[in-house]
Amino acid sequence: SQGFSTPTVAETLTPEGQINTDLKPETGTNFELGFKGNWLRNRLYTELSLYSIQIDNLLVAQRISEDQYVGINAGKTNHNGIEFLINYNFAFAKKILVKPYLNAALNFFEFDEFINNDQDFTGNKLPGVPKYTMNFGLDFKTESGFELFTNYRIVGELPLNDANSEYNDSYNLLNLKASYSFKIYPGLQLNLYAGVNNALDVHYASSILTNAVGFGNQAPRYYYPGNPRNYYGGIQMSYCF
């Protein structure tokens, strides 16, 4: 498939507030091959996707002051990747449903041709895109209404700028949630739940500002820190008419 994306009004403005007539819309061609399947009497489900996207004149935001950005074209880029998902359902002791799962993505994104301000970034990895991401865990559900959800997330390192001179380290996060549902009246159901995010209290960046620039003799601020270990809980009530 093929497509295009035009610049926004903000991206077309120069630092002087004039329209940048040299800015071009980005165009792309996408190739994708996918597969889905159920196995072992529908207990095992799998997905696999391979894709390749070639983009010309990729639109990127370049920071020129503390709160001002301009749009530029980043030549040609390649976005290649693999995504897959596996989950399995089986009953344990006939009253407990166990569901292990795994989904992951491998990303191979790079500049195929990009020269900006006499700097050649051709062959560099695209900033802000991790090498890989992975989620896996076990979910439990009982006939009595008790449920337990576990999720372990792995995010690979990623470049912070076009030059690939700075990187954000990889990190792992563990999230847990438990709930209990029961009827308190015919048609009226109550759900109690509680959980913990970042159970291992990992220091990580929840969001990234690519190609950050330092101002006022300050270092560039690439990172916005993620929340430390935190807890939550609640009560939900539902009624079926």
Language-model segments: what does each one mean?
Residues 33-37, 84-88, 102, 136-142, ...:
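Residues on the lipid-exposed face of transmembrane beta-strands in outer-membrane beta-barrel proteins
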Residues 2, 25, 37-39, 76, ...:
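Residue-level signature of outer-membrane beta-barrel architecture
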Residues 1-32, 43-46, 50-72, 112-115, ...:
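Surface-exposed extracellular loop regions of Gram-negative outer-membrane beta-barrel proteins
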Residues 27-31, 78-82, 128-134, 170-174, ...:
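Residues that define the transmembrane beta-barrel architecture of outer-membrane proteins
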Residues 41-46, 93-98, 144-148, 184-190, ...:
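Repeated loop/turn-to-beta-strand initiation elements of outer-membrane beta-barrel proteins
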Residues 50-54, 72-160:
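Gram-negative outer-membrane beta-barrel transporters
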Residues 98-99, 157-159, 180-241:
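C-terminal beta-signal and adjacent terminal beta-strands/loops
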Residues 19-25, 36, 70-74, 90, ...:
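Outer-membrane beta-barrel proteins
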